Amino acid sequence: FEYDRLYDELVELENETGIHMSGSPTSKVGYETLSELPKENHEKPMLSLDKTKSVDTLAEFAGVHKCLLSWKLDGLTVVLTYNNGELVKAVTRGNGYVGEVITPNAKVFKNIPLTIPYKGELILRGEAIITYSDFNRINDSIIDDAEKYKNPRNLCSGSVRQLNNEITAKRNVCLLYPSPS
């Protein structure tokens, strides 16, 4: 009875807020297997930012640009597209001009809302990551040292690009996205 009460409360909260998370027990996400990941051109190129180790250069840049500073995230860049509040597409950065469509995989990321209370089109760019604790958990389950992943970024990249999104779901991929583009 307690589970049913909490489940009903969650349904009510999701309906009130318009937010339905991919990990919610109310989201009946079936797993999908693809034969290959389709490719798609980006509407706007997703080019790399210049790097600096100079505080002065960074201060000069920040003085003339609106910016957000964060720790370097070593993951995989992903673009999410919502139409009228529904997640309709997720594409990797790829070469900056052409990426791979990973929508079924993004729908099982640990923290991506499948629906949001927003009318119109909303495009978010973020970084898909796997935490060090999940990286260590997954590597610890692999017996052969030669088969272990070298770093969380390699594991994340392979997880995001899986043809079977059940594997993606088990790896706890998260997307960090600071602001709309």
Model-identified regions with their sequence ranges:
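Phosphate/adenylate-binding "loop-and-lid" substructures adjacent to NTP/NAD/dNTP-binding pockets
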Residues: 1-116, 136, 154
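Short active-site loop/helix that positions an aromatic residue
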Residues: 9-10, 137-141, 160-163, 167
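Extended, highly charged clamp/arch subdomains and adjacent linkers
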Residues: 133
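Structural signature of FAD isoalloxazine-binding scaffolds in flavoprotein oxidoreductases
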Residues: 166-176
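Short, hydrophobic/aliphatic alpha-helical segments
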Residues: 33, 137-150
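Nucleic-acid 5′ end/cap handling module spanning
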Residues: 73, 79-82, 148-153, 157-168
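Long, non-coiled-coil amphipathic alpha-helical linker/lever segments
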Residues: 118-129
